[in-house]
Amino acid sequence: MALDENKRKAIDLAIKQIDKAFGKGALVRLGEKPVEKIDSISTGSLGLDIALGIGGIPQGRIIEIYGPESSGKTTLALQVIAECQKKGGICAFIDAEHALDVSYAKRLGVDAENLLVSQPDYGEQALEILETLTRSGAVDLIVVDSVAALTPKSEIDGDMGDQHVGLQARLMSQALRKVTGVLHKMNTTVIFINQIRMKIGMMGYGSPETTTGGNALKFYASVRIDVRRIASLKQGEQHIGNRVKAKVVKNKVAPPFREAEFDIMFGEGISQEGELIDYGVKLDIVDKSGSWLSYGDKKLGQGKENAKAFLKENKEIANEIQAKIIGAIGSSDEITTFGDDEDESENLES
């Protein structure tokens, strides 16, 4: 639609004034700025990467991972750190809970020697560290574990029984307002791990669950992932891991409400080989005959655990299966934007 000449001149003048005040590019016409592919960081789970729609979590955005205790939230965040480090990224872990298990992180593939770690004394300190790291432009990924542990200093200094209504929510709201724009400019991703609480006096319809820290994080997060443990995995009588469901309840860069299920093995993290078998069977890439699993003319093993062990030792076959799975589901790297189930048995026989 052609603009009136006077309006066009007025708009051009306004753009020049804005560029002079705030820097070139502060206001542009949509047609003048190229459409860019969203960069992503893999979660370490093939299924969750596919569910997220762009091959992982988006860079330069705020991500929230929440769920009940022992559901795999921190494990998932550590897997993202490991994947980011593999690409040469610099990562930081703000351990507000003072509970980071370094030996476990190493087993998940985290380069602990080069991981920046802070154990802040109170919430304001944690969020100031977050802001400083973000503004440096040198850090690719920051994990905050957890929102519930970001206790305001006034609450720590106060007496037991003192009322501090809404302090944490205001703290989070202020911090998110300050860092959101900087994150995008610096292409820094922040993952907030959060816990679930029950709503007090909840009656009638709606979920009785809510996350801590107020509503600000819900609004500022580009992606929110709900992580739940749905089954305990056994080998004979021994518990060897958990079956986890991750639901993308909010997604600003791809369609939301997609789900993924994967195994988290004790001491190992997300079982990537297990996902290859699960998706391979569903897509008829891996054949299942009784308890035997095979790929083409190659026997993978009897039972899922033996097949997983085979794929661990034969990376070429695992990569081939993964490529076929991605090809069958469709490329997850095609989302662009403007701007810089089957139930599984709880008992796994080997």
From Swiss-Prot:
<keyword id="KW-0742">SOS response</keyword>
<keyword id="KW-0067">ATP-binding</keyword>
<dbReference type="GO" id="GO:0006281">
    <property type="term" value="P:DNA repair"/>
</dbReference>
<dbReference type="Pfam" id="PF21096">
    <property type="entry name" value="RecA_C"/>
</dbReference>
<dbReference type="GO" id="GO:0005829">
    <property type="term" value="C:cytosol"/>
</dbReference>
<dbReference type="InterPro" id="IPR020584">
    <property type="entry name" value="DNA_recomb/repair_RecA_CS"/>
</dbReference>
<dbReference type="InterPro" id="IPR013765">
    <property type="entry name" value="DNA_recomb/repair_RecA"/>
</dbReference>
<keyword id="KW-0547">Nucleotide-binding</keyword>
<keyword id="KW-0227">DNA damage</keyword>
<feature type="binding site">
    <location>
        <begin position="67"/>
        <end position="74"/>
    </location>
    <ligand>
        <name>ATP</name>
    </ligand>
</feature>
<dbReference type="InterPro" id="IPR003593">
    <property type="entry name" value="AAA+_ATPase"/>
</dbReference>
<comment type="similarity">
    <text>Belongs to the RecA family.</text>
</comment>
<keyword id="KW-0963">Cytoplasm</keyword>
<dbReference type="InterPro" id="IPR049261">
    <property type="entry name" value="RecA-like_C"/>
</dbReference>
<dbReference type="InterPro" id="IPR023400">
    <property type="entry name" value="RecA_C_sf"/>
</dbReference>
<dbReference type="InterPro" id="IPR049428">
    <property type="entry name" value="RecA-like_N"/>
</dbReference>
<keyword id="KW-0238">DNA-binding</keyword>
<dbReference type="GO" id="GO:0005524">
    <property type="term" value="F:ATP binding"/>
</dbReference>
<dbReference type="Pfam" id="PF00154">
    <property type="entry name" value="RecA"/>
</dbReference>
<keyword id="KW-0233">DNA recombination</keyword>
<keyword id="KW-0234">DNA repair</keyword>
<dbReference type="GO" id="GO:0016887">
    <property type="term" value="F:ATP hydrolysis activity"/>
</dbReference>
<comment type="function">
    <text>Can catalyze the hydrolysis of ATP in the presence of single-stranded DNA, the ATP-dependent uptake of single-stranded DNA by duplex DNA, and the ATP-dependent hybridization of homologous single-stranded DNAs. It interacts with LexA causing its activation and leading to its autocatalytic cleavage.</text>
</comment>
<dbReference type="InterPro" id="IPR027417">
    <property type="entry name" value="P-loop_NTPase"/>
</dbReference>
<dbReference type="GO" id="GO:0009432">
    <property type="term" value="P:SOS response"/>
</dbReference>
<dbReference type="GO" id="GO:0006310">
    <property type="term" value="P:DNA recombination"/>
</dbReference>
<dbReference type="GO" id="GO:0003684">
    <property type="term" value="F:damaged DNA binding"/>
</dbReference>
<dbReference type="GO" id="GO:0140664">
    <property type="term" value="F:ATP-dependent DNA damage sensor activity"/>
</dbReference>
<dbReference type="InterPro" id="IPR020588">
    <property type="entry name" value="RecA_ATP-bd"/>
</dbReference>
<dbReference type="GO" id="GO:0003697">
    <property type="term" value="F:single-stranded DNA binding"/>
</dbReference>
<dbReference type="InterPro" id="IPR020587">
    <property type="entry name" value="RecA_monomer-monomer_interface"/>
</dbReference>
<protein>
    <recommendedName>
        <fullName>Protein RecA</fullName>
    </recommendedName>
</protein>
